[in-house]
Every structure is written in C-alpha cells, then in structure tokens.
C-alpha cells in the first residue's frame, strides 16, 4: 500500500497537513483532561452511537450492499454498549496501578495522533468502537474509510465528533479523510506526527501499516479453523456454526471458514446442516464454487461474494439450491492453492473436511490456520478436555473459542468475557 505509491499533490499535502496539525493540537490539549472529564465524554459518545445504531446500519447496507441490516444494528450495539460496560470503570488517566513492593507505579499516557483505516465489512461499528477507545485513552484520530463505504463511515465519525465536542472534547479530536487515495494513506502512515497506525482491513492495509516503521495495530484477515470432534454435541455445534457463519452474511473475520469433522460424526453432522437450511455441494459444485469465488492469483475471495446471501452466491456460481438456503457447504480434501475454498470466505460459504483421526484433524486445522489466519481465531467443539488442550496448544490464534460460535464468541460479551 505504501510501496511504489506516488506522493500527493501540493494542494492535497496542504489538506493532509491541516488534518494532522488539528489532530496534534487536540491530542496535546487532551493530555490535560482528568479521568472524570474523559468518562463524561465517553458516556456521551456511547449513548450517541447507541442512539444511531439503526440508522447507521441502514446507511451501511444502502451504501455497501453488504451484510444484513439487523446484524449490523447488533454490531453497532456491541461496539458501543457492550464495550462501554467493559471499560466504564477502568482507569486510563494518571496513576492506574501501584507496585509498592517493587517501588513502581504505572502511569497511563496517551500516544497522540492515530491514523485509522476502516473496512467495508464493518464500516460503522468499527468507527464507533475506535472513537470510544480514543476518548477513553485521550487520543486524536484521523479516519480513512474504505472508498466504497465512505458515506456511512463519515457519518459515524460526524456523530461521534459532534457529540464529543458538545461534551467538552478538544476540537479536532476526530476527522475523516475526504475523497482519499492510496497516496493519502501512504503519506499519513509516514507522517512524523502520526504516532500509531490502527489498520482494520485486508492484507494490503495491514501489511502497509506494519511496514510503515511506526507502532501499528493490525486487524487483518482470519481463516478460522473449526474442529468438530467426535465427543461434541453435534446439534449444538451445527446451530452455533450456522448462527455464526450467517451473521451479517459472514462478514466478521472471526467467522468459521473450514470445519474439520471426525469421521465418526461426519455424516450425522452434514445431515443436521441440511435439516437447518444448508446446501451440501457435490464434488463438481464445490469445484465450480471455488473457481467462481476465489481469485487463483491472489488466493482471496472475489469482492462480488463478500457479505452476500447464500442463494445469490449460488446463482452467480450457477448452482441450483432451495430458495430458503442459508449456507453453502463445500467438501474439500486438502488445504492450499489447489483447494481454493480453504481460504477465508467472508460470506455464507463453509468448507468441510472429513478427518480419519484426531491427529489428522488437528493437522488440517493447523494447515488452515497457517493458510491465512495466524494469530486470529479458532474454534473447537468437544467434551474431551485433552483434545481441547491439544487444540489450544497447536493453533496459533489470539482467541480459542470452545463450544461456542466463532464470530459472536469473538465479539465477546455474549458467550464469554472477551470484549
């Protein structure tokens, strides 16, 4: 993203410098705020985001044509109310911890100006969340929305900014790039006064953030492996997977991507999927689906499939399915470029693999994990504590979800406390 990208014009640089200067001033003023000041503003912006959860979700659907309205409302609620309940009593100003036995105190200091990339899949909830966290930590943010979701993201920024100002936040604490380009992003990532890059998006965005030479937080693609082990409650697992994988049409990067199923319960599991509205692809259908949905050169899902309904994806691929089909399930026999559906699929398409043993199942889950989801999310359904521990030891993921839906479990606040 920053490599081989031309510099902005002089006029554009003046605009970008103005945004940075404004944010830098706001961040400097913010350092003088007390915990009481911060918490007052946080509560106000949380309530504003919550009040606008539905209209922002509707605006996102209208602009991007991605996802499910009701689920985007829930995302906005999680990003505001759920997050607030988790952080409301946390100290973020001045001395926050003391270690008298070591003669140490921990003092919270803001980092300054944050440059933040916003994805098309979660264009409003991500803004709401980042605004709340910025206020709580006394930082200023320059937002760079996805070009195809600029209107809804910019509206979310406007709502949070105006509310924050009304309740005493410094002027310029939030801003949003207008009609921006890759050149703008590259310029701001390299800017000496930008202290942190917060990139939520695709591989390119995250790679650019980490290649900038600055501190960066990258939230990129997940390729969530799921192990459905023979001792699991199959009915519960299938319901959880369908709920999770169809939530917002599969746009959460923690959603299930490949389910590795023990041989002993494979047939019963697929039967339950069909009972609950899934379509099991034949070998030929799976091949067509993979060829249609995944770009062979990049190994990424084609944009036309992101966040679309299963029946619409089936239509594009030329598959005949029932009109009430919720999920497309494609059997695969390996992981890697020769098995295109083993990659991340931000849509209601799920790969399944039949494993002859626990060792094989765990190996395939590791392969899926390494095929594009390192450090992200993994799920295991089992009553066997030894299997659960082995899974956790082998898989490189920041979140190991046990006997719960991947996407909703990773959001936190519902099935666990991982907010």
Where are these regions (language model features)?
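C-terminal segments
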Residues: 3-21, 39, 87, 279, ...
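Conserved active-site and cofactor/substrate-binding residues in soluble primary-metabolism enzymes
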Residues: 14, 18-21, 33-36, 40-44, ...
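Structural signal for hydrophobic packing residues in well-ordered secondary-structure cores
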Residues: 20, 24-27, 31-34, 42-53, ...
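N-terminal Rossmann-like NAD(P)+-binding subdomain of aldehyde/semialdehyde dehydrogenases
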Residues: 2-105, 133, 275
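Rossmann-like NAD(P) dinucleotide-binding subdomain of oxidoreductase/dehydrogenase enzymes
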Residues: 95-236
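Conserved C-terminal structural/oligomerization subdomain of aldehyde/semialdehyde dehydrogenase
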Residues: 5-8, 31, 319-419
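Short loop-to-beta-strand entry elements in the cores of soluble alpha/beta enzymes
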Residues: 27, 137-152, 215-229, 245-283, ...
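ALDH superfamily catalytic-core signature
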Residues: 3, 10-13, 206-336
């Amino acid at each position: 993203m920053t490599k081989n990208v031309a510099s902005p014009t002089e006029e554009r640089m003046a605009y970008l410098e103005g945004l940075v200067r404004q944010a830098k001033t706001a961040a400097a003023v913010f350092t003088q705020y007390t915990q009481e000041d911060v918490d007052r503003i946080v509560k106000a912006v949380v309530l504003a985001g919550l009040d606008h959860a539905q209209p922002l979700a509707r605006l996102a659907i209208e602009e991007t044509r991605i996802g499910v309205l009701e689920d985007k409302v829930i995302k906005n609620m999680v990003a505001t109310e759920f997050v607030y309940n988790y952080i409301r009593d946390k100290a973020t100003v001045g001395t926050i911890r003391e270690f008298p036995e070591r003669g140490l105190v921990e003092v919270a200091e803001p980092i300054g100006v944050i440059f933040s990339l916003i994805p098309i899949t979660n264009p409003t909830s991500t803004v709401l969340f980042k605004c709340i966290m910025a206020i709580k930590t006394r930082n200023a943010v320059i937002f760079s929305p996805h070009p195809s979701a600029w209107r809804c993201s910019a509206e979310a920024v406007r709502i949070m900014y105006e509310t924050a100002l009304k309740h005493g936040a410094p002027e310029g604490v939030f801003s949003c790039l207008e009609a921006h380009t890759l050149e703008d992003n590259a310029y701001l990532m390299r800017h000496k006064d930008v202290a942190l890059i917060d990139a939520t998006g695709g591989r390119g965005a995250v790679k650019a953030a980490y290649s900038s030479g600055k501190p960066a937080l990258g939230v990129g693609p997940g390729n969530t492996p799921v192990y459905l082990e023979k001792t699991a409650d199959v009915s519960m697992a299938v319901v959880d997977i369908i709920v999770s994988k169809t939530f917002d049409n599969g746009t959460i990067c923690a959603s299930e991507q490949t389910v590795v199923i023990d041989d002993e319960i494979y047939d019963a599991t697929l039967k339950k999927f069909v009972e609950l509205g899934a379509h099991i692809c034949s070998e030929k259908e799976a091949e067509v689906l993979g060829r249609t949905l995944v770009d062979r050169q990049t190994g990424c899902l084609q944009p036309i499939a992101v966040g679309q309904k299963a029946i619409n994806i089936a239509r594009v691929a030329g598959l005949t399915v029932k009109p009430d089909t919720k999920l497309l399930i494609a059997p695969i026999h390996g992981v890697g470029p020769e098995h295109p559906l083993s990659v991340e699929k931000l849509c209601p398409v799920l790969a399944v693999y039949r494993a002859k043993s626990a060792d094989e199942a765990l190996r395939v889950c590791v392969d899926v994990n390494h095929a594009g989801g390192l450090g992200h999310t993994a799920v295991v359904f089992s009553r066997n504590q030894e299997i659960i521990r082995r899974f956790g030891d082998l898989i490189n993921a920041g979140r190991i979800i046990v006997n719960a839906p991947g996407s909703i479990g990773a959001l936190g606040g519902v099935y666990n406390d991982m907010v």
